Amino acid sequence: MTLFLLKHLLKNIFLRTMNIIAQTARLLIRELTPEDERLLLDLDADARLTRYVKKRTEQESKKVFKDTLRDYQKKTGMGRWGIFNLADNDFVGVCILDYSEFDRNSIELGYRLHLKYWGSGIATELAQAIVSYGLNEIGLKEICAVTHPENKASQKVLFKAGFQPHGRAFWHGDDLPFFKVSRSTF
């Protein structure tokens, strides 16, 4: 067996054991493991990253993490995943593709990245990969997203990932821009 084939085989075995959702040029998106809990807790504790979303207590974050691990057993193809830098395995953030909290009939994309990755194109790369995964791999008809009205950077990411404005959504008392992307327009 050549060295190339051996490396390819080992990489595929590694990816399957890590429950990889998607891989891009710079990112590895995978299911979280029990050892990743501190990563999510630290992300949720950073006030700079929760400026546009509801802040969680540490106990709430621990419950979200526990529920996330439990939900993987459902094998729906959806969930909350860790985002890791492919070059050095640095934790970039989290993303979610799951039933929306504001409309249980919709599947929503969400993401939160560490500050050092803002402005690098990582969010767009991530959003495009997850939209492609949702529409092409698990066969969703459409995916929605909401942003805080002042979060113009996230709105730009959504446009670059193929989303279009689709009215407003009301969530936790906030009136939010609502976006959708469908298989027919992606």
Q: Model-flagged regions — what are they?
A:
Residues 3-51, 80, 84-186:
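Acyl-donor (CoA/ACP) binding surface of acyl/acetyltransferases
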Residues 15-16, 67-69:
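A generic local structural motif
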Residues 44, 53, 72-74:
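Hydrophobic residues in alpha-helical segments
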Residues 48-68:
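Conserved GNAT-fold acetyl-CoA-binding loop/helix
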Residues 56-60, 79, 150:
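Short, conserved alpha-helical segments within structured domains
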Residues 69-82:
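A short helix-loop-beta-strand connector motif used in the catalytic cores of GNAT acetyltransferases and
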